[in-house]
C-alpha cells in the first residue's frame, strides 16, 4: 500500500490465479468482518460477483450494486494503521437515472449511511457540461464520503472515468 497525504493506492504482485472480475471494480472498502460484510451486502441488494477469497494479506470479495457499480470488500489479517489524511477524498460513482434511487437505497442500507444532499439541479460544469444541470447525491457513512453523479452517460473526457475527488 502506498499512502499519500490525500489517499492510498494498493499494489499487489499476485503469484496465484486472480478470480475474474477482480481488478475491474471501481473502488474498495476495508471491512472488519468479511463474512458479515458479504452477507450484509447481499441482503442490502448487492450481487456477489466473486465470493471471498484469500489474498497475500487477508481476504477479498467483489460485489455489484444496482447500476453495475462493482466494489471490492477487503479484510486484512492484521489491521492496518494508517496516518490520518490531510484531506479526505470522496468516492465518485456515476450511475444512470434508471439505477440511481436503487443504488443509493441499497448502498445506504449496507453502509448504515446517510443521504446528506440530493440536488436535482447541480451545476453541469462539474461533469464537463457547463450549460446543463444534473442530479448529484452526497452520502456519508463509516466508509467515508460518496458522491453519486446521475447522468445520461454522455460525458466528455475525463468525466465519468475518475473514481475519487474532493469537494
Task: For the regions a language model picked out, list residue spans one by one.
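Core segments of cupin and vicinal oxygen chelate
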Residues: 1-9, 43, 51-65, 93-145
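Conserved beta-strand in the GNAT
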Residues: 10-12, 72, 147-149
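ER-lumen resident redox/N-glycosylation machinery signature
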Residues: 14-18, 75-78, 120, 124, ...
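Vicinal oxygen chelate
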Residues: 2-7, 14-42, 59-64, 88-98, ...
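Short, low-complexity N-terminal intrinsically disordered segments enriched in polar/charged residues
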Residues: 83-85
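Short, structured interface segments
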Residues: 61-81
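Residue-level detector of anion-binding/catalytic polar loops
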Residues: 47
Amino acid at each position: 500500500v502506498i499512502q499519500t497525504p490525500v489517499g492510498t493506492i494498493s499494489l499487489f504482485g499476485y503469484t496465484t490465479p486472480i478470480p475474474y472480475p477482480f481488478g475491474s471494480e471501481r473502488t474498495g472498502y476495508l471491512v472488519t468482518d468479511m463474512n458479515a460484510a458479504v452477507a450484509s451486502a447481499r441482503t442490502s441488494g448487492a450481487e456477489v460477483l466473486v465470493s471471498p477469497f484469500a489474498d497475500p494479506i487477508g481476504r477479498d470479495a467483489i460485489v455489484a450494486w444496482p447500476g453495475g457499480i462493482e466494489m471490492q470488500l477487503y479484510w486484512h489479517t492484521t489491521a492496518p494503521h494508517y496516518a490520518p489524511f490531510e484531506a479526505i477524498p470522496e468516492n465518485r460513482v456515476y450511475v444512470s437515472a434508471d439505477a440511481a434511487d436503487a443504488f443509493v437505497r441499497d448502498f445506504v442500507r449496507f453502509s448504515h449511511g446517510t443521504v446528506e444532499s440530493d440536488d436535482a439541479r447541480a451545476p453541469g460544469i462539474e461533469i464537463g457540461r457547463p450549460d446543463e444541470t444534473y442530479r448529484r447525491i452526497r452520502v456519508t457513512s463509516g466508509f467515508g464520503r460518496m458522491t453519486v453523479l446521475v447522468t445520461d452517460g454522455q460525458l466528455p473526457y475525463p468525466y465519468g472515468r475518475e473514481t475519487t475527488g474532493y469537494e
